Design a protein with these regions (language model features):
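Carbohydrate-active catalytic/glycan-binding domains of CAZyme proteins
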Residues: 1-327
Length: 327
């Protein structure tokens, strides 16, 4: 069996949740895990806020684990705020790589700014790629300006001292709409991780069944490449699909069924959305980290009022396990 057909063993409960955390900064939204393992320690960076949904406000937190399944939130969270960004007001979709050659954590992320109408609805936003480095994953030196003008959810692989590849959502045109951004995944190349060249054509595009293709994550193994990404499908559901490639350039899309579906169960934390996949190759197993939406629409906002979000709320992070022997 190929990795894109892996049988994932998911937990009944999230590993982190805005509904159960004791930390005050992420009690409304909790979103987009990115995980690395260095030695015997697993580190997870993730996003959160305690104001309300649909706002360009999101900070960055850190959690650690010794087994990849049970996590402890860092006491100094959030470790980075919107005020630490050189552009915009919200952290979005980080991706962290530990560079073993330089003994350095490197993070690519999106910086978001938004504009609302008179009813408080987000009607326009700009999303630009940023970069930061850290010796320990806690204290970060943020690059002082955006490094690419259009993006969402970068995923970076380092092939050598001067060879980086990235897959990221990007708008085909400089003035493209948000729907264009989340409907196209491109491949990029760089010699330093800062200056990026985008391929002329996207490698994955939205279609009639998958109305978006967003949050790409790529794993390379002996058989080639597997890319996971999230998609809006019928029924108000968002699920993780896959494509595979032998060279990272030409992809075969496996859209007949999701690689990691929402359960559709109204009682499950991941009943409505499975999103922002992050797959860790961890010895004799793979770990799939993801954020999730349940079917609830109500939440308590930061001002104490009860608010309604018709699309649900990103408020859980889950993990699923697949032993390599089962693939």
């Amino acid at each position: 069996m190929s990795l894109h057909r892996a049988h994932w063993q998911r937990s009944d409960q999230p590993i982190l949740s805005a509904m159960t955390t004791d930390q005050a900064w992420c009690q409304v939204q909790l979103y987009n895990p990115t995980v690395v393992r260095v030695g015997c320690t697993y580190k997870m960076w993730y996003l959160g806020n305690s104001s309300e949904t649909r706002r360009p406000e999101m900070n960055l937190g850190l959690a650690e684990s010794t087994d990849g399944v049970h996590w402890t939130e860092h006491s100094d969270n959030p470790i980075l705020h919107g005020s630490d960004l050189p552009f915009g007001s919200a952290w979005q979709t980080p991706h962290v790589l530990f560079d073993v050659d330089e003994n350095l954590y490197k993070m690519w992320f999106i910086m978001l700014t938004g504009r609302k109408d008179g009813q408080g609805r987000l009607v326009d936003m700009a999303q630009k790629l940023g970069y930061a480095v850290s010796p320990d994953g806690l204290q970060w030196d943020v690059h002082p300006e955006p490094i690419y003008p259009s993006g969402r959810r970068p995923c970076v692989i380092k092939d050598g001292p001067k060879a980086y590849r990235m897959w990221m959502n990007s708008s085909p045109t400089p003035d493209g709409a948000f729907e264009d951004l989340v409907g196209n995944i491109y491949r990029f190349e760089s010699t330093d991780g800062l200056s990026w060249t985008r391929d002329p054509q996207p490698v994955v595009t939205a279609n009639e069944k998958l109305r978006s293709v967003v949050y790409p994550f790529v794993v390379e193994d002996e058989s080639g490449y597997t890319m996971w990404y999230g998609s809006h499908v019928d029924g108000g559901v968002f699920e993780i699909f896959c494509s595979t490639s032998t060279d990272g350039l030409t992809w075969t899309h496996h859209h007949d069924e999701p690689a990691f579906p929402a359960t559709r169960n109204p009682n499950d934390f991941d009943g409505r959305y499975t999103s922002t996949p992050c797959v860790l190759d961890d010895g004799d197993r793979y770990l799939l980290y993801y954020c999730a939406r349940d079917w609830g629409n109500l939440y308590r906002a930061g001002d104490g009022t009860i608010k309604f979000d018709g699309a649900g709320v990103y408020r859980h992070i889950g993990v699923a396990v697949c032993p390599k022997a089962a693939i």
